[in-house]
Swiss-Prot record:
Single Gene Ontology MF annotation: ATP binding
Protein name: Cysteine--tRNA ligase
Subunit and partners: Monomer.
Binding site for ATP: K274
Main location: cytoplasm
Any single Gene Ontology cellular-component annotation: cytosol
Reaction(s) catalysed (UniProt annotation): tRNA(Cys) + L-cysteine + ATP = L-cysteinyl-tRNA(Cys) + AMP + diphosphate
Family label: Belongs to the class-I aminoacyl-tRNA synthetase family.
Species annotation: Lachnospira eligens (strain ATCC 27750 / DSM 3376 / VPI C15-48 / C15-B4)
Listed cofactors: Zn(2+)
Span of the annotated motif 'KMSKS' region: 271-275
Primary enzyme class: ligase
Amino acid sequence: MRIYNTLSRRKEEFKPLEEGKVKMYVCGPTVYNLIHIGNARPMIVFDTVRRYLEYKGYDVNYVSNFTDVDDKIIKKANEEGVSAEEISTRYIAECKKDMEGMNIKPATTHPLATQEIGGMIDMIQTLIDKGYAYEVNGTVYYRTRKFAEYGKLSKKNIDDLEAGHRDEAHSLKVTGEDEKEDPLDFVLWKPKKEGEPSWPSPWSDGRPGWHIECSVMSKKYLADEIDIHAGGEDLIFPHHENEIAQSEAANGVPFSKYWMHNAFLNIDNKKMSKSLGNFFTVRDISREYDLEVLRFFMLSAHYRNPVNFSHDLMESAKNGLDRILTAVDNLRHLSENAKDVIMTEDEKKIIASIDDIYKKFEDSMDDDFNTADAISAIFELVKLANSNSSSDNSKEYIDTLMKKITTLTDILGLKTDKKEEMLDEDIEALIAERQQARKDKNFARADEIRDELLAKGIVLKDTREGVRWSRA
């Protein structure tokens, strides 16, 4: 198995630090709103990486955090007149609903930044003691130039960097830039401002900088040195670069052996942004498609290639997924009435020929998790099943064919189990209850009903003429 390592900029043979075990950390979302489809890509991609590693026999300790203290969370809380904790708790719950819809397995651990403040204070103190950090007026900064290998992940030369040369969306804006020893130094701890959550520390009542959070949670729930650290390519600099500087200075060992990053997602060939009106949450997509279609769409491209999201491409993904699900459904129906006899020699030959398709699938996944080519192998298997199955076949043969397909779809996290169909009158009754909830301004219950129907494959569309529904 070969993985493209951002650190070396080449594919490397995958050899975990401990045989048979994989320690994997994936940067999770900042929970101040519903997750958008850009957030969904790393969730789906690295969940699939995890599933394939488990299929290969590895014991995967998969840690993915929730950033539950951040400027955006505080801003949202102040706008709504509630606590930051209330905002983060609400959107963690909503995020988990979306993750379930996309069939993303719960992480081994989902740590919360606010629950790990003690560990962050300890690591910051270690960095101060080692001379890698310093305190000024209650703020603690990291001495960027002291870490000789700074820039090794992003391939940025520290001498070419200028203050402010950081992703604007992720920059930690701290007043008093002139108090830094060097403009490139970044914040580890900042003093509280009015209306912000804070924690006591040796330097000031305040809160941690964003970068220190992942260094500490990775250390606590995995180890000082881990196998895979992953996230979107927008995190390479400054977030992951700063994590390396913190962790390696504090712990004295390499932070992660392999670094994996997924490419950006565009909408109709444009960057997704609220100002362009092309911003979609996962919940938005769920109103038109089963979220399994979104998962299939994301896996139809290699994770390191940019993905272009459009309605036409989602329709294409829906049709592709339907081909697979229909094949499994047909086999399921054949199995119910098939003869309970042993396989014939001809049937055994067909099953044996599937080994070649499995090899194609595994070769694709072993080559830096090429899910696009892996899906092509599944389509090849579906074609074989469609043209070599009938009511004349044995039950053992039909069941084996079906199992061969579902083993591969399970690796990609694509569910093939049949959804129980709701009766029309039950659907109409729930829609009526939803309409009443909206009249009563009980929007939480209205959303709950819509999500409940969606989970059963029923898509609602609000129109001027009333609510229309269809089966996904």
